[in-house]
Regions:
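A structural motif corresponding to the C-terminal end of an alpha-helix
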Residues: 66-74, 92, 154, 185-189
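Alpha-helical packing segments of well-folded alpha/beta enzyme cores
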Residues: 60-67, 71, 113, 143, ...
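Divalent metal-coordination and catalytic microenvironments
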Residues: 13, 68, 76, 98, ...
Length: 285
């Protein structure tokens, strides 16, 4: 069996093409000229074919739904911040899954906001970008711990960027080895990595073997570049740990992703888990 075409994919990373000002938080800490003054998208040097022409669309929700329908995506996880996302969640609760971007630097304000969004939207996940904060916050920093504890209390996962970040900002706060401390201190936490874990994918696999709650999502990687360690792990002992995530419209088009996906060498029994079942379980859908 090849990649199934009618499974009802769950995409755990989708955004809306609302404007390039959403990247200003990265420009604030970058020091190179291209990131601060030239690039519309801070990782243009990596993503040459980003669908930038979609940004500024009159109806960004309609644009995203159209693309989801084209490629068989039944549901997509989005942030619950901002008017566009909140409209999408209200108008299409059967298509969009609410998550919240958290910032440990905001302390108890974000803990209270997590509870508010859980009660208002039925929050299904928290998301974090350690290298994107100002100041940056290491994955195992004590400032993160109240957020991890609240995720355990609400019984929701947290999706966290790990590995060398794409933007030209410092990387130390996202080293994969830091995840070990978190999983040790929060054995009940469901922790899903984002953005590759490179160059430490072999370590990520070892940690997933060690910690039941640790998972890996494929966000920000075109399928032709999925790490070999991750594909091999999915095909052996990790079929329940690897979760599909795209990067539309931030850096990748769904057309590119779904044109390349059939060439990923997953075994037959891995595809349904990768494209749908693992996300449904982790997000309690």
């Amino acid at each position: 069996m090849s990649m199934p075409l009618d499974i009802g994919v769950i995409d755990t990373m989708v955004g809306f093409p609302v404007g390039f000002e959403i990247y200003d938080f990265i420009r604030k800490q970058a020091k190179d000229w291209d990131t601060r003054e030239t690039f519309q998208f801070p990782v243009e040097y990596l993503f040459k074919g980003a669908p930038k022409d979609l940004f500024g669309a009159d109806d960004p929700v309609a644009v995203v739904l159209h693309e989801m329908d084209r490629f068989g995506i039944e549901r997509a996880m989005i942030g619950c911040e901002g008017d566009v996302s909140q409209h999408a969640l209200a108008a299409h609760p059967d298509r969009f899954i609410p998550s919240m971007s958290v910032d440990p630097n905001r302390g108890m304000d974000d803990i209270r906001k997590m509870v508010e969004n859980y009660e208002r939207f039925g929050l299904k996940a928290a998301t974090a970008f350690p290298a994107g904060y100002v100041p940056q916050v290491p994955i195992n920093d004590r400032r993160f711990y109240p957020i991890y504890a609240k995720c355990c209390e609400l019984d929701i996962p947290i999706f966290v960027c790990a590995g060398v970040p794409g933007p030209r900002i410092k990387m130390a706060c996202q080293q994969v080895e830091l995840i070990d401390d978190v999983m040790y201190d929060f054995p009940d936490l469901t922790f899903v990595t984002r953005h590759g874990c490179e160059p430490w994918t072999d370590l990520a696999v070892k940690l997933m073997l060690k910690w039941p709650g640790l998972h890996y999502s494929t966000s920000a990687f075109a399928p032709k570049y999925y790490p070999r360690d991750i594909i091999d792990y999915a095909n052996t002992r990790g079929a329940d740990k690897i979760i599909y995530a795209g990067y539309f419209p931030m850096g990748l088009s769904l057309e590119r992703i779904f044109n390349e996906l059939p060439n990923v060498g997953f075994k037959d029994d891995v595809w349904p888990k990768f494209l749908r079942e693992n996300a449904a379980r982790v997000l309690k859908l």
